[in-house]
Amino acid sequence: IAKVFGTKYFITDVLFTKDNVEITEPKLVSLILDTRCDNMRIESNNGGRIFALNVRKAVKAKNEKCIIQAKPTTANKETRILLKSGWIKKHCYFLAEGEYKKGSDYDRFMKALTSYKKEGGNKHDDAPDGMTILAENVEFIGLCQNNRTRQVARAR
């Protein structure tokens, strides 16, 4: 979850898990409702489209509004990550280590994000890929030019 202030994106919460969809869907719905997220992009490769539809239905059933887009990614993941890394470094702000619990989704996310190597050999690239999808979503919906305060997110 990114709270947006102008062109600054504060990453305040994440859902970072390898759990199956029966566990992940309700967790994501709760996260959307708890944070009042209003825009989300879900990668629709490998069943993500159905996942996105289910999350959208569950959020709507709670009478909440969140634009949930399902979009496939076709470009090379490593190339996309490297292309957006400068934008992420410039615009994204993360919680300090003492602001999240050790062993939490946020902790695992930060470890995965900060251990990514641009030379390759990355077994676990979900965290940088998630941030890349956030950057692409921001570009897609044009938030960089918009100074409204919003909350946007990305999920896999």
PLM regions and their residue ranges:
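Short, surface-exposed amphipathic charged segments that create phosphate/polyanion-binding patches used
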Residues: 80-91, 108-116
